[in-house]
Amino acid sequence: MDRRLSKKEEERIVNELNKLQMIEMVDTSVNLTNKCFQSCITNFRIRKLDDEEQLCVYKCVEKNMFFTSALNNHFMKLSNEGMF
């Protein structure tokens, strides 16, 4: 029995996957913000970040973006090899 999805079902699934992907991206962004804030921001007496805090936040975000990119590349490689 050939059970293919109709065009409408396919569109619905793609839309749901896109929504889930957006939610995941927002969650990742919020988690990264919280992680870097907790790791880097130490002085709450002044409104602006000092130079040390700014550098820490920059390095924290850069490190996490590099890791995420490397992880995505690895998953793409596995997917292209048919392993994922």
UniProtKB/Swiss-Prot annotation:
- Mainly resides where? mitochondrion
Please tell me whether the keyword Cell membrane is annotated for this protein. no
* Localization per Swiss-Prot or TrEMBL: Mitochondrion inner membrane
Gene Ontology BP, a term: protein insertion into mitochondrial inner membrane
Pfam family name, one? zf-Tim10_DDP
- Any idea which GO molecular function terms this record carries? metal ion binding
Q: Does the keyword Zinc apply?
A: yes
Keyword list (alphabetical) reads: Disulfide bond, Membrane, Metal-binding, Mitochondrion, Mitochondrion inner membrane, Protein transport, Translocation, Transport, Zinc
* InterPro entries, alphabetized: Mito_inner_translocase_sub, Tim10-like, Tim10-like_dom_sf
Gene3D superfamilies, A to Z: Mitochondrial import inner membrane translocase subunit tim13 like domains
Its record classes its membrane topology as: Peripheral membrane protein
GO cellular component assignments: mitochondrial inner membrane; mitochondrial intermembrane space protein transporter complex
Write out the residue ranges of the motif Twin CX3C motif: 36-60
User: Which Cys pairs are S-S linked?
Assistant: 36-60, 40-56
- Record note on quaternary structure: Heterohexamer; composed of 3 copies of timm9 and 3 copies of timm10, named soluble 70 kDa complex. Associates directly with the TIM22 complex, whose core is composed of timm22. Interacts with the transmembrane regions of multi-pass transmembrane proteins in transit.
Give the similarity note: Belongs to the small Tim family.
Q: Give the protein's biological function.
A: Component of the TIM22 complex, a complex that mediates the import and insertion of multi-pass transmembrane proteins into the mitochondrial inner membrane. The TIM22 complex forms a twin-pore translocase that uses the membrane potential as external driving force.
Written domain comment of the UniProt record: The twin CX3C motif contains 4 conserved Cys residues that form 2 disulfide bonds in the mitochondrial intermembrane space. However, during the transit of timm9/timm10 from cytoplasm into mitochondrion, the Cys residues probably coordinate zinc, thereby preventing folding and allowing its transfer across mitochondrial outer membrane.
- Protein name listed in UniProt: Mitochondrial import inner membrane translocase subunit Tim9
Q: Which organism is it from?
A: Dictyostelium discoideum
Record gene name: timm9
